[in-house]
């Protein structure tokens, strides 16, 4: 017998930015009953699941999945003080669905993680890292991705996916809000999964900006796997520095600046 998961109603509402009143209007289920279903006071029946699925045009199977809910605070995307809560919830809900889908596929295919190296090089320091330390970790990361120590990274997405990191576009970017979300990438450094996910938000950005965004999230996955106690500002600063050091290693930067100095 199929069991329906009340947490999926909450997840759907976060993604679709739907209030209980709006769901009542579309399904005919009272707000009181929806609240009781969500809080597991009354059973979530197939009849109710079918009404909700029809209302939001979701497959019925969506409401029987059992992914562990992800608190928005565990994700690494940035937001301004004026970003609306419903936009934050939509981004985190979409990421949760993506990560859950990737996890199920990995389990069915019996895929094993090839990312032990992240655990090996992830820092445990309780204080912000020096630029020298971040440069060193960025260089180690390039080697684990089978990249040269210097020179451009031709395809960031391919380099990440080759080692077992899924890179996926997202759509919950807050375009309908007066205060758009300030983030362009999302990840969850502490999530225990064989295939971690980097999500990037669908804006009309240049290729260089997208490359930076993806490596920025890779930086979070490595630098903050064991250091989530840092402030958000500290984590963002470190991930920025990591992305810069990964995409333009120190030796490349020195060579470029030395050449420019000689020309002038």
Regions picked out by a protein language model, each given a short descriptive name:
Residues 1-264:
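Short juxta-domain linker segments that transition from a proline/glycine-rich
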